[in-house]
């Protein structure tokens, strides 16, 4: 069986990595070895940060809900407990959107939570 030299395959594979490394600084977009290393690191960061993004958005929503709830004389934890008691099923994303874009609707939700807590 004759020996097959992998020139075209190797070139294609390296070209693919260098294309992924486009926009990197210094040798990291020019040299295969450093580009390959950086692309692997970038993949690791992307994997980690896709999960981090979910945590970050949840933190942002909670901060917005807390700020709006405190403007209505209620803490975040009291509001969430009140909503649970009142059986109002709204997720944090929806509540944060109400707090930012429709203050009157958010105030009515807070009043419903207060009423449920005072029963």
Swiss-Prot record:
Q: Which GO terms describe its molecular function?
A: rRNA binding; structural constituent of ribosome
Species: Latilactobacillus sakei subsp. sakei (strain 23K) (Lactobacillus sakei subsp. sakei)
A Pfam short name: Ribosomal_L20
What function does the entry list? Binds directly to 23S ribosomal RNA and is necessary for the in vitro assembly process of the 50S ribosomal subunit. It is not involved in the protein synthesizing functions of that subunit.
**GO cellular component terms, semicolon-separated:** ribonucleoprotein complex; ribosome
Name of the protein in question: Large ribosomal subunit protein bL20
Family affiliation: Belongs to the bacterial ribosomal protein bL20 family.
Whether rRNA-binding counts among this entry's keywords is: yes
Q: Does the keyword DNA-binding apply?
A: no
Tell me which Gene Ontology terms the entry assigns under biological process: ribosomal large subunit assembly; translation
Give the record's keywords alphabetically: Ribonucleoprotein, Ribosomal protein, RNA-binding, rRNA-binding
Q: Which gene encodes it?
A: rplT
